[in-house]
Amino acid sequence: MGRKWANIVAKKTAKDGATSKVYAKFGVEIYVAAKQGEPDPELNTALKFVIDRAKQAQVPKHVIDKAIDKAKGNTDETFVEGRYEGFGPNGSMIIVDTLTSNVNRTAANVRAAYGKNGGNMGAAGSVSYLFDKKGVIVFKGDDADSIFELLLEADVDVDDVEAEDGSITVYTAPTDLHKAILALRESGISEFQVTELEMIPQSEVTLEGDDLAVFEKLVDALEADDDVQKVYHNVADV
């Protein structure tokens, strides 16, 4: 599983990096986190979390600094979170999380991306009840038992700890992700491949041939929208 999450980040970074969309999306997320609290990551846990994720995605320091500087200024641009759920081919399900300054524009764009690429946008809640929100942390290591005990001693609500191919993957309750990261840092672990809040499907489907091609095109179209921050789905190995 550790390799899976690290591969997802690597694929997304490689794909988004060609157009720098990942920089712009993290820029917005950093701006919002800094604007809603202190523009200092040492005083703002949410901001520090976003910056750590940005670094994992290889976002340059100047992009991070620019977003924080913007939040320190007189700019009063307002961003609103949104969620759009829908369906792709052959049992595939998708959740799209957005952060936008224009809800009407974003809703229209996401609906069009679904409709023009073999998908259908559903009602709120039509898909998300089949996913579980969890914190996911991935770092190098092989002793899952000691990590599990360490987190329990730190009073972290741990769902599971897995070790595979030299990586450890920790699943936590979403409210305890920050606490888990802090406990791991205090134990001497300083580098993480993944620290994310994820919507994890309760079961996965496997797509092949034309269905897989349609699904990948649909996900690409959704991720290409500047207002889309995260796309979750239930398709295995994508």
From Swiss-Prot:
GO terms for cellular component: cytosol. Pfam families: TACO1_YebC_N, Transcrip_reg. Signal peptide: none annotated. Keywords: Cytoplasm, DNA-binding, Transcription, Transcription regulation. GO terms for biological process: regulation of DNA-templated transcription. Its main location: cytoplasm. One of its GO terms (molecular function) is DNA binding. InterPro entries: Integrase-like_N, TACO1_YebC-like_2nd/3rd_dom, TACO1_YebC_N, Transcrip_reg_TACO1-like, Transcrip_reg_TACO1-like_dom3, Transcrip_reg_TACO1_YeeN, YebC-like. It is found in: Cytoplasm. NCBIfam families: PRK00110.1 (NF001030), PRK12378.1 (NF009044), YebC/PmpR family DNA-binding transcriptional regulator (TIGR01033). PANTHER family: TRANSLATIONAL ACTIVATOR OF CYTOCHROME C OXIDASE 1 (PTHR12532:SF0). Belongs to the TACO1 family. YeeN subfamily. This is Probable transcriptional regulatory protein Sez_1681. It comes from Streptococcus equi subsp. zooepidemicus (strain MGCS10565). The lineage of its organism: Bacteria, Bacillati, Bacillota, Bacilli, Lactobacillales.
